[in-house]
């Protein structure tokens, strides 16, 4: 009770000395600095356990439910694989995760690799966008660069994010966290012998130096992101490895999320998806891999194997239509003329009315480049249209013939193709170009040549009239050409996009024009999907017959197969010209 009797001055309190062993009331009271550090420690532990809450409460970024789950799994597993459909914001989510990891775990070294350096740089660009909307993130970042050769993010706490090219030149880097975006596009040898070697010593915070915390060592992490691909590819085996390890309870996580979740969360427009699926050149195989997060495996009866074709995707620069070269103002981007001895073909599979299954016209340009054994076949251009009038198609063939300086036309002259042949045998007036074309005639079939009433018409058309024996030979020759590497085809769309980005002016083009450039690469992907869908049936005499699944097409296959067959005919003629006559007495001297 407080009263004057109990009141004591400080002087009288210590009149009998100070007991230094007596603890005062504030003995356990911590300083402001100590309380601050305790609070930081508590919140850090909480946010490390709940990284999705850190994104919302500290960074001020709102996540969808599936994104919360993915962020959580990224932080709490050593190995993570995310197979995403288009439209889920995979790159954006990766950039958010990188910021979370870098802030909550000071001193973290993050390396991002991809099929191309440009793709990896997109993560840095997304972080640049994020910091503009998040004041706390902006305060955490010390330096950020998005330049091609030095893209990086440095944080005040010592963490950093850098990008590397997926090649042998990336050796000697060091990291605690490796992220490989579009990992299916990276060579497995590069991942195993170069990129994974970055992960040497794990993050070593100072508290590990204390004996009571020495057991809390951290592990390095690996994160792989992509869409699904073909089962014959190494990435599928990697997926199976991750799945089996996850099911055994190891610190592995793998998931595939289809396009429906992007629609549900408002990230993808439902009507847009319907429109794409209703397009006449809709590719169900590509759709299942890219949008449904499903791996595709060719059937046991498939005549063409994916790996035999894919290994020949080596042409970075196809031949674009000549007028495209004026759209990019770069002196290094120019049309490639013929080489000495080169022959060019435009090979065609003709369709009739639009709207029918298995019914599309395909025009393919071949470059036959001489080598010591004959010709290398380069498929440099392909376009497809769904049906059309015979006169219109004949005019388009003549346009391509002129544009690419072709020497021969290869044409299936059965059924609808016969009408196109007859149109080519007549003078053609091109209204679009205000030009008249001279008539052409057949070079390899006298009966077909007789249909041309112009005696002086140049003989440049190779007529193809399929039958069981010829169709079998054509299929065998095409399969052999791909297996032996005699046929070269353009690289995939993603690699093609990165190739085009090298040229000044490409980035400034409209999306529609960019799409026209990329179609030269996309057509080859559609060709591959057609070919690996073809199943073989063998007759008693050993002939092969190829059958496409119901409602599927093989127009691109036919166009390419016809062109390759005539290339073989020309190659045999070339080799015959160079052979010695065994009866020539000069041979013996």
Swiss-Prot record:
SUPFAM superfamilies: P-loop containing nucleoside triphosphate hydrolases. Pfam families: Terminase_6N. InterPro entries: P-loop_NTPase. Disulfide bonds: none annotated. This is SPbeta prophage-derived uncharacterized protein YonF. It comes from Bacillus subtilis (strain 168). The lineage of its organism: Bacteria, Bacillati, Bacillota, Bacilli, Bacillales. The gene is yonF.
């Amino acid at each position: 009770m407080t009263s004057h009797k109990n009141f004591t001055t400080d002087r009288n309190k210590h009149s009998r000395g100070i007991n230094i062993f007596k603890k005062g009331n504030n003995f356990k009271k911590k300083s402001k600095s100590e309380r601050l550090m305790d609070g930081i420690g508590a919140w850090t532990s909480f946010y490390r356990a709940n990284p999705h809450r850190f994104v919302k409460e500290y960074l001020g970024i709102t996540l969808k439910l599936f994104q919360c789950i993915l962020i959580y799994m990224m932080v709490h597993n050593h190995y993570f694989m995310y197979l995403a459909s288009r439209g889920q914001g995979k790159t954006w989510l990766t950039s958010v995760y990188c910021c979370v990891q870098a802030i909550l775990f000071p001193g973290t070294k993050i390396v991002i690799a991809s099929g191309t350096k440009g793709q990896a740089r997109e993560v840095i660009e997304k972080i640049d966008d994020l910091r503009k909307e998040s004041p706390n993130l902006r305060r955490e970042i010390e330096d950020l660069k998005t330049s091609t050769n030095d893209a990086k993010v440095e944080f005040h706490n010592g963490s950093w994010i850098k990008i590397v090219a997926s090649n042998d030149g990336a050796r000697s880097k060091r990291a605690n966290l490796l992220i490989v975006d579009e990992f299916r596009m990276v060579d497995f040898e590069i991942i195993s012998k170069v990129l994974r070697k970055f992960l040497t010593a794990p993050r070593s915070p100072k508290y590990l130096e204390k004996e009571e915390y020495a057991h809390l060592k951290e592990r390095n992490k690996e994160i792989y992101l992509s869409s699904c691909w073909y089962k014959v590819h190494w990435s599928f085996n990697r997926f199976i490895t991750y799945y089996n390890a996850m099911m055994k309870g190891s610190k592995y996580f793998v998931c595939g999320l289809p396009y429906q979740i992007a629609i549900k969360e408002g990230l993808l427009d439902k009507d847009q998806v319907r429109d794409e699926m209703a397009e006449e050149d809709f590719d169900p195989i590509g759709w299942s891999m890219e949008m449904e997060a499903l791996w595709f495996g060719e059937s046991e009866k498939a005549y063409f194997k994916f790996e035999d074709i894919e290994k020949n995707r080596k042409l970075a620069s196809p031949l674009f239509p000549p007028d495209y070269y004026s759209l990019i103002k770069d002196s290094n981007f120019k049309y490639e003329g013929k080489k000495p001895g080169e022959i060019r073909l435009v090979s065609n599979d003709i369709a009739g009315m639009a709207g029918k299954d298995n019914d599309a016209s395909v025009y393919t340009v071949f470059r036959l480049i001489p080598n010591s054994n004959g010709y290398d076949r380069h498929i440099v251009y392909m376009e497809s249209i769904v049906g059309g009038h015979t006169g219109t198609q004949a005019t388009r063939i003549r346009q391509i013939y002129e544009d690419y300086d072709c020497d021969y036309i290869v044409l299936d002259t059965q059924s609808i193709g016969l009408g196109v042949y007859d149109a080519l045998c007549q003078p053609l007036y091109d209204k679009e170009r205000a030009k008249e074309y001279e008539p052409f005639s057949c070079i390899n079939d006298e009966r077909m040549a007789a249909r041309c009433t112009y005696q002086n018409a140049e003989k440049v058309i190779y007529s193809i009239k399929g039958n069981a024996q010829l169709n079998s030979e054509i299929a065998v020759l095409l399969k052999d050409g791909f297996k032996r590497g005699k046929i070269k085809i353009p690289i995939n769309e993603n690699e093609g996009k990165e190739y085009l980005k090298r040229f000044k002016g490409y980035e400034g083009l409209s999306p529609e024009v960019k799409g026209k450039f990329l179609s030269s690469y996309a057509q080859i992907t559609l060709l591959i999907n057609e070919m690996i869908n073809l199943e073989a049936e063998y007759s008693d005499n050993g002939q092969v017959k190829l059958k496409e699944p119901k409602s599927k097409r093989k127009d691109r296959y036919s166009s390419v197969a016809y062109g390759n067959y005539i290339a073989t005919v020309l190659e045999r003629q070339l080799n015959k010209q160079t052979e010695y006559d065994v009866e020539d007495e000069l041979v013996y001297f």
